[in-house]
C-alpha cells in the first residue's frame, strides 16, 4: 500500500477516535511505526494531512451515496437511504472532529462545507 494512503487512513482512524487536535504528527508517526521526518516527506504539515483526510472521507461517502441512488426504488426511498447513510456517518464521528476542523483547520473545514453544500444540491435535485 502507498505510504500516503496508509498515513491518511491511520490519520482518519485516529482523528475519528480522539479528535483532530488531540492527535499530533508525533503520535501519528509512532502509530505508523515511522519517524516524523518520514511522515513529513509525505505531508508537509498537519493541515495538509487534515485536508487529505477530509477529501478522502467525503469522496467515500459520495461514492456510497451514488451507489445508494442507483439501487433506490424511487426518489423518496433514495433520499431516505442517503440521509440514513449520512446520519450514520455523523453518529460514528467524534463530535470534536467538526469542532477541531472549524476552529483549527479552516481549509479542511472549508473543504467539508463545500462538499456538504455540493452533496446536498446534487442529491436534492
Annotate each predicted stretch with a short phrase.
Residues 1-2:
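N-terminal intrinsically disordered/low-complexity leader segments
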Residues 6, 10, 14-48, 52:
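Helix-turn-helix
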Residues 19-20, 66, 70, 95-101:
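Short, flexible helix-adjacent loops and helix caps
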Residues 37, 63-66, 107-110, 114:
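Positions in alpha-helical segments
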Residues 52, 56, 66-92:
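Hydrophobic alpha-helical connector segments
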Residues 88-125:
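Short secondary-structure transition hinges
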Amino acid at each position: 500500500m502507498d505510504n500516503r494512503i496508509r498515513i491518511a487512513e491511520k490519520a482518519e482512524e485516529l482523528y475519528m477516535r480522539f479528535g483532530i487536535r488531540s492527535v499530533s504528527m508525533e503520535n501519528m508517526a509512532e502509530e505508523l511505526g515511522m519517524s516524523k521526518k518520514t511522515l513529513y516527506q509525505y505531508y508537509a504539515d498537519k493541515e495538509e494531512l487534515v485536508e487529505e483526510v477530509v477529501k478522502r472521507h467525503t469522496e467515500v461517502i459520495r461514492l456510497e451515496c451514488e451507489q445508494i441512488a442507483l439501487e433506490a426504488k424511487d426518489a423518496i426511498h433514495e433520499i431516505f437511504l442517503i440521509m440514513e447513510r449520512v446520519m450514520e456517518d455523523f453518529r460514528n464521528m467524534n463530535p470534536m472532529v467538526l469542532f477541531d476542523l472549524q476552529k483549527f483547520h479552516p481549509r479542511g473545514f472549508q473543504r467539508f462545507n463545500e462538499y456538504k453544500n455540493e452533496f446536498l444540491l446534487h442529491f436534492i435535485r
